[in-house]
Amino acid sequence: FDTKSSTYTYIISSGNGREALIIDPVLENVNEYINILKKLDLQLVKVIDTHIHADHITGASKLKDITKCSTIMGDHTPADAVEIKVKDDEYIKLENLKIKAMYTPGHTSDSYSFLMDNYLFSGDTLLINGTGRTDFQNGDSKDAYNSIFNKLLKLPDETFLYPAHDYKGEKVSTIGKEKKQNPRLQVGSV
């Protein structure tokens, strides 16, 4: 967790081998990630960014320089330095794990969420008791509504939600809990 930007970064490993990937790495914390990987005897092979935004100063390029990992984003990203651009419903593999890319625009036009089994890494699209802002940097409230209500909230209620930000110290929720308690989801339409 980066206290300056309130950004959560996730390190994922299959548990069956040494490969790891990182979702939404923060540039200022790259050395911390490298130390964690070394301590756990993991090799970073992939880095995924959910989107580009002012509060997402990515450490992907620096991690690539250090570890030779692949950098991944959704195919709507304007970023030139990304090696692999995944499409909606495409899978990213990490040893025996499969992570589904889900195009979820709204917060930004390049926002993606990533689903691994029943774990959703939602970037800034769906937050705990909130949603990502749509009022600047290529945001669109209708796209956000469609991404959240017609895609993410269609996932099973027991799906765990891991957002890229939280400003109140919450770390995890579920789709079911968000449907019931998230004040921004208590709307009929846009």
Protein language model regions, located:
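Short, conserved glycine- and acidic-residue-centered signature motifs
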Residues: 26, 56, 137-141
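Metallo-beta-lactamase
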Residues: 18, 98, 108-189
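Conserved beta-strand hairpin/beta-sheet module of binuclear metal-dependent hydrolase folds
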Residues: 1-42, 113-123, 129
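Hydrophobic residues in well-ordered beta-strands that form the structural core
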Residues: 23, 71-73, 122, 163
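Short secondary-structure boundary/capping segments
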Residues: 1-2, 13-14, 61-62, 83-84, ...
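Divalent metal-coordination and catalytic microenvironments
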Residues: 12, 24, 51, 63, ...
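Active-site HxH/HxHxD metal-binding segment of metal-dependent hydrolases
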Residues: 5-6, 17-18, 27-103, 180, ...
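Generic anion/oxyanion-binding catalytic loop in active/binding sites
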Residues: 22, 52, 133
